């Protein structure tokens, strides 16, 4: 089947795939066509970041679906966000990213809107307009995610 991959520059790439193909396979096909190494690719479908080991079928990606390709810049920092259930989400950030941007990354992976997220690091609640660097958040840092219920303070 054919699927489309749209880049940030607005270019659309057409790929021939099977629904049993993994996201890894799709990234390899994008590398063949565009020369972008898979470790620099992030694929988004229906607002979610696609994980390498999963298949197109797992995400219900069908013929003529459009995926969005976002480039992960070199020098990105991998941090972890731990949820109340104990689940750890790995997120790639830049030191200059605002906390709001970090929350957007959490939303891409978990579907939790940024307004419902409170991020805690080193015992402090993080302000949206500050950067990861402002809080000395580095590779391997673990942030804690607390959900803010509507109407709560």
UniProtKB/Swiss-Prot annotation:
The gene is RUB1. One of its GO terms (cellular component) is nucleus. InterPro entries: Nedd8-like, Ubiquitin-like_dom, Ubiquitin-like_domsf, Ubiquitin_CS, Ubiquitin_dom, Ubiquitin_ubiquitin-like. Keywords: Cytoplasm, Isopeptide bond, Nucleus, Repeat, Ubl conjugation, Ubl conjugation pathway. Ubiquitin is generally synthesized as a polyubiquitin precursor with tandem head to tail repeats. Often, there is one to three additional amino acids after the last repeat, removed in the mature protein. Alternatively, ubiquitin extension protein is synthesized as a single copy of ubiquitin fused to a ribosomal protein (either L40 or S27A) or to an ubiquitin-related protein (either RUB1 or RUB2). Following translation, extension protein is cleaved from ubiquitin. The lineage of its organism: Eukaryota, Viridiplantae, Streptophyta, Embryophyta, Tracheophyta. This is Ubiquitin-NEDD8-like protein RUB1. There is a cross-link at residues 48, 63 (Glycyl lysine isopeptide (Lys-Gly) (interchain with G-Cter in ubiquitin)). SMART domains: UBQ. It holds the Pfam family ubiquitin.
């Amino acid at each position: 089947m054919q699927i489309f991959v749209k880049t940030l520059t607005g270019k659309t790439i057409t790929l021939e795939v099977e629904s049993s193909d993994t996201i890894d396979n799709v990234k390899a096909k994008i590398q063949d066509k565009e020369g972008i190494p898979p470790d620099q690719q992030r694929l988004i479908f229906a607002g979610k970041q696609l994980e390498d080991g999963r298949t197109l079928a797992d995400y219900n990606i069908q013929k003529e679906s459009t995926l969005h390709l976002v480039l992960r810049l070199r020098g990105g920092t991998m941090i972890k966000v731990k949820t109340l259930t104990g689940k750890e989400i790995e997120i790639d950030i830049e030191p200059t990213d605002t906390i709001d941007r970090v929350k957007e990354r959490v939303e891409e992976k978990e579907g939790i809107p940024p307004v419902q997220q409170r991020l805690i690091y080193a015992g402090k609640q993080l302000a949206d307009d500050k950067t990861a660097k402002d809080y000395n958040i580095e590779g391997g840092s673990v942030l804690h995610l607390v959900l803010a219920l509507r109407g709560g303070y």
